[in-house]
Structure formats: structure tokens, C-alpha cells
């Protein structure tokens, strides 16, 4: 009996074929320029031996890389401000004593319940096939921003090179839905 080793699809994955969205950030979604499926790493458990080498066994801890999104900044900076205000809402950027009405998304008091809908959001990456139709859907659960790059201004450029920023996110997990 012969084995069929032909792949189901002979088309290569194009880096141009994607749609990305984070529920909390509609303007960032529209101007997204680049996004990558984060790395995934499995921990190892070393098993010492009587010899000079040790054996490695797969562990049970999974570590995900960062979700990194590069986007063009619109002239009103609305998409930059979406992320900036999200970061500001989950941190104490103005000090420990938040004024009335300036509490973080976590709540005003230490015992108040965490406002998860304000802190986290879900994200979806639609990977498109060669005909630019949805092929795979990857969902990211409990996404939150951890970094936002600088906004560069430069009067020495000879051509208009639109401003791009990169936002870095952490998340609890990601899954391939389809």
C-alpha cells in the first residue's frame, strides 16, 4: 500500500493575508500594519543521571511570547490614544492617590472587584488563504497592553513617511478556532 505524501494545499501562506481586531480598539484594528502569531515554549524538566549528560523531559508549563501589533497612527492620534488610555486606566500613572473619578480599571479600593471588562479584551487574528478568504481564526483571551513605542517626528525626511507605532500585549492563551 502506497502512502499519499501530497499536501492538501500547495499554496504558501502569504504575510499580506490577515485581518486583526481587538474589541477595545477599533481604530487600531483599521490601521494595523503588522502582527505576528506569538511564540510558544514548553518548559523542560531536567533529570540528572550518573553520566555527564542529563535527560530532558517535557514539563507542564507553557510560556507564550508577546503579541506585537504595528499600526499607522492617524492624524488625530485616536488609535494611539486608545492604547495610551487603556494603559493609563489599568495603572496608577498619576500616583497612588487617585482623585475622585480617576480610579484605575481595577477599582478605587483595594477590596473592590476587578473590572475585568475594563482591564482585558479579547482579540482575533483571521488568517486569509491565497484567495483572501478567511482560512484560520486565532483567538487571544484576556489581552492587555504592556508597552507602546514612541511617536517619532522628523523634519529632515524628504518624503512623507507616515508614523508607525508598535503596541505590545500579554494574554492568557491563544487558540486556533478554525
For the regions a protein language model found, what residue spans apply to each?
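Glycine-rich, low-complexity intrinsically disordered segments
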Residues: 1-178
